[in-house]
């Protein structure tokens, strides 16, 4: 598909964050040309471009055209839980509100809730998401139907899915579609047995891929992990060879 976006203020993210008036051409899902309006007119007059049959021509009317935002931590199917019991500590919120309600969700529910979330993403300038939730196949279907780029993340835990299922999803979605990819992950240390985390670690080393999880989110989580294993969550997971770290809320000094 050939798309022409013109009459736009363009932010290219080059050093200096320069903004200029111009247009962008997209050919077969790739940006093929970006230029200021004056530069484009001069080159066009010199016939340096073949005449292109555009599938879509969009007048941006002076609005800003820029790379899309990337939301690196989403649970799209949880849109229905927004503002529900936000005043509870995390463990009570999960066990008294989230888990009981999630147990009632069907695949169709998650599909529609993900579509709702994608609507919010797209109208906020978010073009890619990193999504950990139930039924990854359903999330992928919703994202494909709406054109949203998505990295699926397995939310492996003691209560749903299995290492075998996660491995099958990993292999399926990392070769099927350019919009969808898949990364290994688990929900949290406190919802996974030590044996389950060993399996995740083995898969990560076998496929040479990162692992993603919720780690050290609350003081309660840290204290309970220390009681179970004599270590903080990062130290415990490090002892299994499971993860490296992106952001923590309660790291110890050595971490």
Regions from the PLM with identified roles:
Residues 64-100, 207-224, 232-244:
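N-terminal-biased segments
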Residues 82-147, 167-176, 246:
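Alpha-helical scaffold segments that flank or form the walls of functional sites
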Residues 8, 24, 29, 62, ...:
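Divalent metal-coordination and catalytic microenvironments
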Residues 1-49:
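N-terminal metal-binding scaffold of metallo-dependent hydrolase/deaminase domains
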Residues 247-255:
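Single conserved hydrophobic/aromatic residue that forms the stacking wall/gate
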Residues 138-245:
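Metal-coordinating catalytic core of metallo-dependent amide/deamination hydrolases
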Residues 19, 29, 33-37, 61, ...:
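Gly/lys/ser-thr-rich phosphate-binding loops in alpha/beta enzymes
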